[in-house]
Amino acid sequence: MKTWKKLLLGFAGIFALTTLAACSSSKDTLEKVQDKGTLTVALNPHFAPFEFKTIQNGKDTIVGADVEIAKAIADELGVKVKFSEMSFDNVLANVQSGKADIAISGISATEERQKIFDFSDTYYESETVLVVKKDATGTYKQTGDFAKKSVAVQKGSIQENIAKANLSDANVVSLAQPGEAINELKSGQVEGVVLEKAIAKGYVDQNSDLAVSDITLKSDSKDAYAVAMPKGSDKLKAKVNKVIAKLKKEGKIDSYVKDAYALSLKSSTK
């Protein structure tokens, strides 16, 4: 009899654990975030004006347009926000592994990425441009001029794909940060850098020896940024879209970008 009781208790315990695990796995990301009271956001803080570091109140602080959007999302959810910084090519991987709840880091919702992640409505649209040395603008007038030349891009970015598609005869060098790519250009290691337009403008304004080329880089669509989250995050996605719609209607996203851009220039002169 005791043996049977032990077996029944054992089965009951296994059933309870299985049921608990099933309930946990079936929870939407929104419920998981609200349960823990914190929204963990993956980003790469080297992409001004969307996310970058500056000194505030004596502390190294992550700021930028994406940061403000993430804060607005956390406010809507009624939770705290925690920013987890990493290299850009690890941002989406952290969402996929569950280490981060969302990723907002100038991420384009490509068809390939949409197979693995849920994405919010787009919150910012831009275009991709090519930065060269100012005294070389006359040398590089079309994509063919970069044949057998080196062009730098940020590893894992949509610009990496655009560069490879448009500059197929060039040597595309993938680097961890946009700043590294700019340094390679200034030192003569590469002849061009492919960047998102707002990012390129920031670097050109800070470096009088650089310029945005007139060369047009073709893409299937405009480079549009969205918030990434785990597949099946329907409830969270609805909340994020609500925040994005409100911010866009109020013109706040454009203000975030403008203010962050001004701050990035100010920070670079310190």
Regions from the language model: what does each represent?
Residues 25-28, 159-172, 211-216, 242-270:
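Ligand-binding clefts/hinges and TM-proximal coupling segments of bilobed small-molecule sensing domains
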Residues 28-106:
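Extracytoplasmic small-molecule ligand-binding "clamshell" domains
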Residues 71, 80-143:
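Acidic, polar ligand-binding/catalytic clefts
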Residues 107-115, 162-165, 186-187, 191-222:
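A ligand-binding cleft/hinge motif common to bilobed small-molecule-binding domains
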Residues 125-132, 201-244, 261-270:
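Periplasmic-binding protein-like
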